[in-house]
From Swiss-Prot:
The keyword Heme does not apply. The lineage of its organism: Eukaryota, Glaucocystophyceae, Cyanophoraceae, Cyanophora. Keywords: Cyanelle, Plastid. GO terms for cellular component: cyanelle. Belongs to the ycf23 family. PANTHER family: PTHR36895, YCF23 PROTEIN (PTHR36895:SF1). This is Uncharacterized protein ycf23. InterPro entries: Uncharacterised_Ycf23 (IPR007570). It comes from Cyanophora paradoxa. Pfam families: DUF561 (PF04481).
Amino acid sequence: MNNKIDNFLKQKKLIKVISGLNNFNTTHVIKIAKAASKTNASFIDIAAAPKLVEKVKKEVPNLPICVSAIKPELFVPCVKAGAELIEIGNFDSLYNQGYKINFSDVLSLVKQTRSLLPDTPLSVTIPYLLPLNLQLELAYRLEDLNVDLIQTEGKINKITSLLDNRNIETILPTLASTYLIANNVTIPVICASGLTISTIELPFKLNASGIGIGNAVSKLNSTEEMINLLNEISTRINYSTVL
């Protein structure tokens, strides 16, 4: 695991910036990456495209890159291009297209991925569609398969800003998953989907090691706005972890 990422995990202060599984707009992704690199963001998670990895790596060499996909064969050229982590997941954008994934699918994808890249740090998203008991069972199985990170998720509606005052009920599924998994397995857990400024600290109270932020950052117009938002997130996380 990259030393920078490992340190954030140990401190339970990891911030993962997600540009989007289906976002292949190089200019936009680099814009997000540059903003992330000027803050305490731990790494950026981008679409699994080798040329995109190369361009982001060239423009922002100090920011670790993770690539997300649901096709294991896509990971190999991306790692060769400079990606340091790989992730099976960030399914949000796929659910709206009717894509479904079940318990067995995840295990199969992990095994296929590990056969191709046995030593590359691997993160896996636990599908929110699974009942909580199956989510925990899947987490145990992922632990046996030496997965390095687990990400939780929940169903979210379109959001325009991380500053939106959203009711906590909208993120209860991902918080419940985070609490259950983070307190029962040794794999670090990242909580994602629907977090806002008012709820950004909650996952850390539930023993999460980090958070994933996507739409709220990517929908901002300027790099400066992205930097300001990520700095605000970092400040709140630092404050919450010292209390």
